[in-house]
UniProtKB/Swiss-Prot annotation:
GO terms for cellular component: cytoplasm. This is Type III pantothenate kinase. InterPro entries: ATPase_NBD (IPR043129), Type_III_PanK (IPR004619). Its EC number is 2.7.1.33. It comes from Caldanaerobacter subterraneus subsp. tengcongensis (strain DSM 15242 / JCM 11007 / NBRC 100824 / MB4). The active site is at D109. It holds the Pfam family Pan_kinase. ATP binds at D6, V7, G8, N9, T10, N11, I12, V13, T132.
Amino acid sequence: MLLAFDVGNTNIVMGVFKGKKLLHSFRISTDKNKTYDEYGMLVNQLIGYNGISLTEIDDVIISSVVPPLMNTLQVMSLKYFRTKPIVVGPGIKTGINIKYDNPKEVGADRIVNAVAAYELYGGPVIVIDFGTATTFCAISEKGEYLGGIIAPGLMISADALFQRTAKLPKIDLTKPPTVINRNTVASMQSGIIYGHVGMVDYIVTRMKGEFAPSAYVVATGGFANMIAEESKTIDTVNEMLTLEGLRIIYERNKE
């Protein structure tokens, strides 16, 4: 079995694959202060709850945008799973030609998403990932990573309003039924969520105009379904896109 780690700034998403089939997925909070033993015990508990033992994990692959955790998870993999993990980074085979000015600047998560989207949906394709940041990636018909956009995510927007104002409260991001609202919390929720929908549709329209009017649009990440319900430009939501991308990259790099 393959254990895949998608390490984001807010959450770590893990997936257990048997061949091409995703058996289980888990989401935990990202904590840079946890040791490799703490992560090892936590992962053991999560997979064990689903009837999988440590010895059944043959390989590990890691994608991380949190540098301090990379070594932690690598050591954890060696100690608890007795395997050297594949790490998404320079030198890894992705099948994607990155056209960024400096390819090393592209986050591992964006590369993984691009690989999955092109493999599953073909090109041209646009990937929107609703994470700590909301990112947009453009992949050409030939599978070239053309670039994209990085915007503040929904939680960052909510936190900024709370932290940078004297009277606005901290809120949960639930969608109000109307855009116009009569209380502060719902008004903030409306501005952040419906404002994000407007941003998404405008940016996707501009992206299509710049590189491919027929581009397919796939969304992923924690808020993807909520935004897709209101968006006029998102074609599909794939919550497991990043994990699928890790599986594909693993298959292209396993010995």
